[in-house]
Swiss-Prot record:
Propeptide residue intervals: 16-114
Subcellular location(s) of the protein: Lysosome; Secreted; Apical cell membrane
UniProt organism field: Oryctolagus cuniculus
Stretch forming the signal peptide: 1-15
Name listed for the protein in its UniProt record: Cathepsin K
Length: 329
């Protein structure tokens, strides 16, 4: 009987004092992520969004416990933002209106030989720590830098943080914090004959004048290759043979915003309309579910320490193979 009472106490407490519990959770969340608001009205507005997100997370995880989903959600530092705000402030992929493919840039896989069933470039030392782009639409710069860092490690044996701010400020074909595209970044590094290190050109998360300095140059690029559009088999081959690959995805759903663990597959995730650039650093299988290992640029508080496992071979889920590319070094 005592065990039953212990089990019932949280339920009774929640039934009697739901607002007090929410108040406590809200204050704890604000403290955890150092949240401050300009006015009481602003805080009330943000709390309503937070409560709606918290409810969504709770319902999803209940469904996941019943086997409806292959992944779980968790509250994070984006809790007081709508999914629309996240896309507006924290993505930044801008695809050129006309993309010309040529034999010079198209990646033609060598289909001879098997690729490994799984690969994780984090374990091979090809991947730098997770970064946070902040509220600057510079995802394209972090994705590009991640692919360049992987190739630098492959060529020289040295893992080095390269400068996304160098790209934000200096790639004239892109729009800095207003968005951009990865192959434009690779072309810039090729034309510029280099990109600075993060130490030489630190990230500030806003548009500034181009301050590239050759004395801080840490890597070069001699071109790029684009994966055949929508071809996950070719993408797998590229990741296995080349290294980390820049990819674009649809990151517009609440389920993506609060991803925590498991293999992410949401049937509402668009395979046509992509809006966010990330980095594919490997692939594998978890509990029978094939996945890509994706490095995001929203800090370690997001996802699984900054990473997400995204469904692989599920009809190009979230458009992951639509705009994949990597630099040549």
């Amino acid at each position: 009987m005592w065990g039953l009472k212990v089990l019932l106490l949280p339920v009774v407490s929640f039934a009697l004092h739901p607002e007090e519990i929410l108040d406590t959770q809200w204050e704890l969340w604000k403290k955890t992520y150092s949240k401050q608001y300009n006015s009481k009205v602003d805080e009330i507005s943000r709390r309503l969004i937070w409560e709606k997100n918290l409810k969504h997370i709770s319902i999803h995880n209940l469904e996941a416990s019943l086997g409806v989903h292959t992944y779980e959600l968790a509250m994070n530092h984006l809790g007081d933002m709508t999914s629309e705000e996240v896309v507006q402030k924290m993505t930044g992929l801008k695809v050129p209106p006309s993309r010309s493919h040529s034999n010079d840039t198209l990646y033609i896989p060598d289909w001879e030989g098997r690729t490994p069933d799984s690969i994780d470039y984090r374990k091979k030392g090809y991947v730098t720590p997770v970064k946070n782009q902040g509220q600057c639409g510079s995802c394209w710069a972090f994705s590009s830098v991640g692919a360049l860092e992987g190739q630098l490690k492959k060529k020289t044996g040295k893992l080095l943080n390269l400068s996304p701010q160098n790209l934000v400020d200096c790639v004239s074909e892109n729009y800095g914090c207003g968005g951009g595209y990865m192959t434009n970044a690779f072309q810039y590094v090729q034309r510029n004959r280099g990109i600075d290190s993060e130490d030489a050109y630190p990230y500030v998360g806003q548009d500034e004048s181009c301050m590239y300095n050759p004395t801080g140059k840490a890597a070069k690029c001699r071109g790029y290759r684009e994966i055949p559009e929508g071809n996950e088999k070719a993408l797998k081959r590229a990741v296995a043979r080349v290294g980390p690959v820049s990819v674009a995805i649809d990151a517009s759903l609440t389920s993506f915003q609060f991803y925590s663990k498991g293999v992410y597959y949401d049937e509402n995730c668009s395979s046509d309309n992509v809006n966010h650039a990330v980095l594919a650093v490997g692939y594998g299988i978890q509990k029978g579910n094939k996945h890509w290992i994706i490095k995001n640029s929203w800090g370690e508080s997001w996802g699984n320490k900054g990473y997400i496992l995204m469904a692989r071979n599920k009809n190009n889920a979230c458009g992951i193979a639509n705009l994949a590319s990597f630099p040549k070094m």
